[in-house]
Every structure is written in structure tokens, then in C-alpha cells.
Amino acid sequence: MLGAILGDIVGSIYEFNNIKTTHFELLNKRSTFTDDSILTIAVADWLLEGALSKERLIFTIKRYVQKYPNPMGGYGSHFQQWAFSDENEPYNSWGNGSAMRVAAVGWAFDTLEETESIAKLTAEITHNHPEGIKGAQATAAAIFMARTLSTKQEIKEYIERKYGYNLSRSCDEIRPVYHFNESCAGTVPEAIIAFLDSSDFETAIRLAVSLGGDTDTLACITGGIAEAFYGMANSLPETTVSEYNFKYLEEETINRLPENLKKVVSEFYQTIVSKNKLFWAKNDSRTIWGEEQWIKTKLDDKKLDEESYRSFLKSYGPDWDMRFGVYYEDGCHYVYRSNFLLKKFKFQKQDDGFYHVIESYTTEKGDYADLIEEVLWQGYFKPPYNYKGFVRGERTY
């Protein structure tokens, strides 16, 4: 996420002063965060809260905009009108605002399916046009794949196949004819290409800015992917370190943010990026000990409301000895602890608006009286947004 923020900061002074070259001053005293960083951090804050509902995201986004009403470059006119109104309905935007705020989602989940699902949710609150949704999903997917060791070729092929973007161009081909374009369709592919053409983190940022146009958003999207792929410090050329007299671009990025934004970014890295889960995917032989034998179990009347369902999917909690968490794959929610799978559940949304458990399986290690409740109570929540929506029968906790 810091890569996205730094890209925004670097591109901030070139948005209305396009330079069409990679040879420029990376940072100076005028370089600052814009609406791209504010909204990126707002989404990260929402993820930290754990209650992954659209209503909570709308509340969080509007709170951030009202606290930072006049960033460099301003907000988009339709978005600003929405943010300062009592109206919460989306306005069918296809703009790149959905993609420039989604970086944190690429770091927060354990499967590509989860990542794309939540990216869609973050877009839909404002950018519910198919192109707006696609731009957010493609950006988050690229970040997820980059941080989970996919190659550039694998990322390119997946994004082209799934989202239909043409990524076979080069920055040198794009640069001479590229102009300001605020659409996802005219920003996200170019930002991904800047990453694909790069050799290290800094080069990726420079390539994105050199294209011209909406430089802060281009570099924000590129920077989010490049950080996940390269890291921000280890790939820096020596000239950057000596010229700017700092070793870590992470530190320089953080130092250009207000204290309360610094706090959210730091908490996001400590809680989500650096949580060091012991378990990543059910087919990962490096983390699963032994073959799992699934035993179908008897169902009881268990259901979750929309907010609790999404929060269950996100749950992750450190325990005194090990850790447990939830991930989604093949239509099931898998609950694990340490290196062992415990249970898996299949939910279905029914006519009453709740998600009901329609299938349930356990392993020999999954002997918990009520694992769904256990996960939600001890899971991934930040006060004062503690879990409160679990429903058993007609009783709500």
C-alpha cells in the first residue's frame, strides 16, 4: 500500500505539468499526497475495522473526505458531491477512482477469489459501472498475484484473459499519444504496463509518471503493484539512496503523511501485511501437515447477516500459542488453526436475506462446539466495531 501512496506523491506535481520522460526529480518539497492516498488509507482503515459491509465503507470514506476536504488536486466533482451529501447511492462512475483506492485489498486476503470479490464491493459504493468495477478488480488482482510470487507473464496473461485489457503495448508506444484520461479503461491498463515494463520499484514509478495524463493516479496504481512485486527498499538503485540521502522510501512516504494517516498505515502493515500467517491455501504442501479427511456433519440452524458473513470471511486472530483464520475457496469457507484445517462451511443467501449454512464438514482436529461463533467473537475486529451480528435460530448475539 505504501507503494501506491508514494506513487501518488511522486505523481502529484506532474499531473498538470506532464513531462513525458523518466528523467525527473523523484521527490521535492512540493510533492505531497492527494485524494488517491486519502481514499487508499480510508479503505485500509475499513479493512482494519473488520466489519466488511458497504454501509461501513461508505461511512468511513465520507468521514475521511470530510476530514480532508481539500487535498492537492481535489476530488472528482461527482465523488465530492456524493461524499458531502446524505445520499449513499452509487452514481454509475467508470472513472479511475475505484482503482486508485483499492491497493489495500490486494494485501488483505488469502485467495484471488476473495480479493476480487472485495475489490468489487469497494468499487460498487460509487463506481458501479462495469468498467469502474473491472478497473478495481484488475488492480487488486495484480497486487495479489504480485505479492504471492506470480511472474510478470502470469499476471499479464491473467489480467488480459479475465478483464480484456490489452497489455501487449510498451510504455514507449503509449507515451507519444497518451493524454489525460480519467477512465478506468484508459488508466488501469497503462498503469499495469508501466509495472510490466519496469526493472525495479523506482523505474516502475518513473515509467508511470512519464506517460503523462493523470500522473498521480497512474503512479498510484503502478506503485501498488510494484511494491507487491519488488518491495520498496531492496530494489532501489544506489543513486537514489545517495541523491536523496535516505535509505528507505517507506520512511520518506510515511513522513509526508499527517499523524492520523501515519497511524492507520502503520497499523495496516503491522496487522495485515506483517501478520505472517502460518497457513495460506489448502493445497499448499508447505503449510498443511498430512492429508485431511472431511466428515460431513449434521446441520443446525445457523445463519449470518450480510455484515457478519463478510466479517467471517475476513476473520483472523492471534491466539496465545498459534493463530486461526478463514479463507474462501471452491465455494467453501475453510477455517484453519496453525497448520491444520478444522472445518469448512458452505453458505447460501436465502430469501430472508441471511446467509445460511447449507453444508458443513469437519476434520478430526475440528472438534469445536461452535466454530463460527468462536471465529467471529475472537476474530478480526477493532473496537468499537466488535462483532455483533451472529444469529442462531431467532436469537441475535
Residue ranges and their predicted role:
Residues 119-123, 308, 373:
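Charged, low-complexity, helix-prone segments enriched in Lys/Glu/Asp/Gln
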Residues 332-366:
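Amphipathic protein-protein interaction modules
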Residues 1-275:
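Structured, active/binding-site neighborhoods that engage oxygen-rich ligands
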Residues 274-330:
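Negatively charged, low-complexity tracts enriched in Asp/Glu with abundant Ser/Thr
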Residues 353-397:
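Polybasic, proline/glycine-rich intrinsically disordered low-complexity segments
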Residues 273-290, 365-373, 394-397:
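Charged/polar interaction segments and conserved charged motifs
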Residues 98, 134, 186, 321, ...:
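Short, well-structured alpha-helical interface segments that form or flank functional binding sites
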